[in-house]
A protein has these predicted regions:
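Bacterial N-terminal signal peptides
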Residues: 3-11
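Active-site-proximal helices and loops of the catalytic beta/alpha 8
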Residues: 222, 367-369, 377-380, 405-407, ...
Length: 786
């Protein structure tokens, strides 16, 4: 997943990493007067050094030799915003006069914010401007981009706030977070604040709808030095109303910062929510972002919210060791064209009958905890207790899970605890603005990841604070949303042991202990819940984790891509099982969100690239026959059952990228009406029905023979299962020509095919069987009800 996270930097809207009164980016010279042309240094110059909101501001760019814009003769424009790009008045590449820079000399351009900085950005954004973000670019930025780095210029306000002396008092609550009173008319806020040097901020205040976002000593928080909490109780609350709020914290050394509550269950995002309202995903009647009154992500609370009436309250996974999981991304499951509004929970719920008919018994949702922006895979989390509004409301999430449970389908959640974005309150609280990373004194995060597989900001899982946070979040998700388990992203990174790409997967007892502690929390909250790890470490470590009850992703994509293309090399399936692992310890998959689609490579490369669709789908049916019949947990990536053949490199604009990307992919529900693709779906469904109806035959004790190496290619691959009363044999021909092979059945008599035909076996040790090209035969010792 590591490479995919790199892509996220390009697709999330604007992350909320504004840290007030601080300058990020390249150094900008301090000036005590407006500079002459001769005084300008290479790079950015601005006057005044700190803009005043009610005064004019000027910015010069002097290009140095080697810069993109050095010697450029065309028009130059600025791309500009405020508060670390939280508000940007125009799309990238818009060439309007308002954004045009004045050329004042060769390789020197000037841009002026007039009549004042605030007036230039407009009244709706005039309040709480902390910094101006700017870069200079050419006039052909959409086709031949030339630009500078980002520069950030501090803006000082017209108002000043002088905090009162901090009152030391015992906090009435035991946990950080939001604590309503029994009657809902008051609420106590508690925020943990103690860095690794045992220091804390100079003061903290509450701002929000309850005080019209005014910073005042009346709402200055008290300090409990035993619990290391800032806390305050707000009275006069309407229990039926939602309120937005933030913590405003300051110190002489670090300046001021606004953060939300890390335990809040809903947030408002001034940069992105408006699009959800326009699309009808987020109700216009619900609480909205307080534009013009604050900046950054806003937390929301309600002291007496309506409770969801669960229709199924006692769902249990029947057999976690034999699950078939359907990995699903809401965004790309029902999206049509550019209408992101269709990629929602409501639309996905309408297709649950399709998933149920397929025969899977679990859905694994890609990350849905609040992430930066609206358009994402979700591996860029910022608020873990809030579900992202990009797909729907809290109630709709619960309705989806409830409907799945009604249909006998478990719901697993992909959780991302390896890292968080800079929008996370813990990251913002102790932040190194010059380096754009968490500070050395941050008690939750590493400055740099000790392992090579991380982006954003790396959690330190040796920290008791991090462990408490993760455990609390897991318990919350199991109890509040009734998730049936989790897939943990990038657990290889849950360590403080320094490593490189060659050693990161080596046996690590500290990593085992950390994951075992999280598993204990999951198990204590719901003994039936499952915990799956994206681990990819040495098998000796994976074995220990599996023996403790966890399951681990196991990537079989390469082998099944090769067989899907009709290529025998590197197509060995035998790696699906290993004598060193507990038989049910691996969750095997042919495809996942991270892997290239088998059907795409089949149509683009290999022996079948010019074959008709009917042939290619038959080959994929044969793949499925040697995947879904193997005992142990399995996972299917969405639409693999229809031969989805758009590459993971496919870009949103319809072109092919040079590497994998997280762009939205076309949703091809029309594939379900195409004869041969529907035939592939039907084969999946038939195999899964056979699996679900005969669990004793798909237990590990029933696994008898597995001849699926490269050397078995020409004579046909073979699988045999036997329980005390039932037997199953699969023979597969991945070649593009018919084969005749001798098959071991174990006993003579009638055997039954999936299509209802009967084979009379007369030679139990070597029955001659003809297998058509690109096909399989599945025989059972009992009649199958299809």
């Amino acid at each position: 997943m590591f490479w995919m996270l790199l892509c996220l930097f390009t697709i999330v809207a604007c992350s909320d990493e504004n840290h007030e009164m601080l300058i990020t980016g390249p150094e900008i010279p301090e000036l005590d007067h407006e500079p002459s042309i001769e005084e300008l240094v290479e790079g950015i110059n601005n006057y005044p050094t700190k803009f005043k909101g009610d005064k004019q501001g000027k910015i010069w760019y002097k290009a140095a030799a080697g810069d993109d814009l050095y010697g450029y003769e065309g028009d130059v424009y600025v791309h500009i915003g405020i508060n670390d790009w939280m508000y940007v008045p125009t799309e990238w590449g818009v060439n309007e006069d308002k954004y045009k820079a004045e050329k004042v000399a060769d390789n020197i351009w000037c841009f002026t914010l007039a009549p004042t900085v605030r007036e230039w950005f407009g009244p709706e954004n005039a309040a709480n401007i902390q910094n101006v973000c700017i870069l200079f670019r050419n006039d052909e930025a959409l086709t031949d981009e030339k630009k500078t780095s980002d520069f950030f210029i501090t803006v000082t306000g017209d108002k000043t706030f002088t905090p009162a002396p901090v009152e030391i008092a015992a906090c009435p609550v035991e946990e950080a977070g939001i604590h309503p009173s029994a009657d809902g008319t008051s609420v106590t806020f508690a925020l943990y604040d103690l860095d690794t040097n045992n220091n804390y901020k100079d003061y903290a205040c509450l701002i929000g709808d309850f005080n019209d976002w005014e910073l005042s000593t009346e709402y200055q928080m008290k300090r409990d030095n035993d619990k290391h909490f800032w806390w305050y109780t707000v009275t006069g609350i309407d229990p039926a109303k939602e309120y937005g709020f933030q913590y405003y914290m300051g110190s002489e050394e670090d300046g001021n910062v606004r953060i939300g509550d890390p335990y809040c269950e809903k947030v408002l995002d001034g940069s992105n929510d408006k699009y959800l309202v326009e699309q009808g995903v987020y109700p216009a009647s619900a609480i909205q972002y307080p534009n013009g009154k604050t900046t950054g992500i806003v937390s929301v609370f309600q002291t007496k919210p309506a409770s969801y009436n669960w229709q199924v309250s006692d769902f249990k996974i029947e057999n976690p060791d034999n699950m078939v999981i359907y990995e699903l991304l809401f965004r790309d499951f029902t999206q049509a064209g550019s209408e992101l509004a269709t990629g929602t929970i409501k639309e996905a719920t309408k297709h649950l009958d399709y998933i149920k008919s397929l025969g899977v018994n679990a859905i694994e949702l890609m990350p849905i905890q609040e992430f930066d922006g609206n358009n994402s895979w979700g591996y860029n989390p910022c608020y873990y207790f809030a579900m992202d509004k990009a797909y729907g409301t809290k109630e709709e999430y619960k309705q989806f899970i409830d409907e799945c449970h009604k249909q006998g389908i478990a719901v697993l959640l992909d959780v991302v605890y390896n890292h968080a974005t800079g929008s996370h309150p813990f990251a913002k609280l102790y932040w190194n603005s010059k380096e754009s990373k968490t500070a050395k004194n941050n008690p939750w995060f590493n400055v740099d990841a000790p392992h090579p597989f991380s982006v954003f900001h790396d959690f330190n899982h040796e920290s008791p604070l991090v462990r408490e946070f993760v455990k609390r979040n897991l318990k919350f998700l199991l109890e509040e949303y009734k998730f049936d388990g989790f897939r943990f992203d990038l657990t290889k990174g849950f360590t403080q042991k320094p490593s490189d790409s060659n050693s990161s997967g080596n046996y690590d007892q500290s990593r085992i202990d950390i994951l075992a502690a999280y598993h204990e929390t999951v198990n204590a909250t719901n003994p039936n819940a499952v915990m799956i790890l994206e681990h990819f470490c040495d098998i000796s470590e994976e074995k220990v984790l599996a023996e403790k009850g966890m399951k681990l992703w196991h990537n079989m994509n390469k082998s099944y891509r090769q067989s899907g293309m009709g290529e025998s090399s590197e197509s060995d399936f035998s790696y699906m099982r290993n004598s060193g692992m507990p038989a049910d310890g691996w969750v095997n998959y042919m495809e996942s969100h991270d892997e290239e689609r088998v059907a795409y490579e089949q149509g683009a490369f290999g022996n079948l690239k010019d074959a008709p669709l009917a042939t290619r789908m038959k080959q994929l049916e044969t793949n499925a026959a040697f995947f879904l019949t193997v005992p142990g947990p399995k996972m299917i990536w969405q639409f693999g059952e229809l031969g989805y053949d758009y590459s993971i490199k496919y870009k949103y604009d319809g072109t092919m990228g040079s590497d994998k990307n997280t762009d939205a992919k076309p949703v091809k529900w029309d594939y379900f009406t195409e004869q041969y693709r529907k035939g592939l779906y039907d084969t999946y469904s038939t195999l899964l029905k056979l699996r679900n109806d005969n669990p004793e035959l798909f237990s590990n004790d029933a696994f008898k023979a597995w001849n699926v190496s490269v050397s078995d290619w020409d004579k046909g691959r073979y699988l045999r299962l036997e329980s005390t009363t039932k037997k199953l044999v699969v023979v597969g021909n991945f070649k593009n020509e018919q084969i005749n092979t001798n098959v071991y059945f174990g006993n003579t008599g009638d055997w039954y095919e999936l299509n209802g035909e009967t084979l009379n076996v007369t030679n139990s040790d070597a029955q001659s069987v003809t297998i058509p090209a690109n096909s399989f035969k599945l025989y059972t010792s009992f009649q199958i009800n299809n």
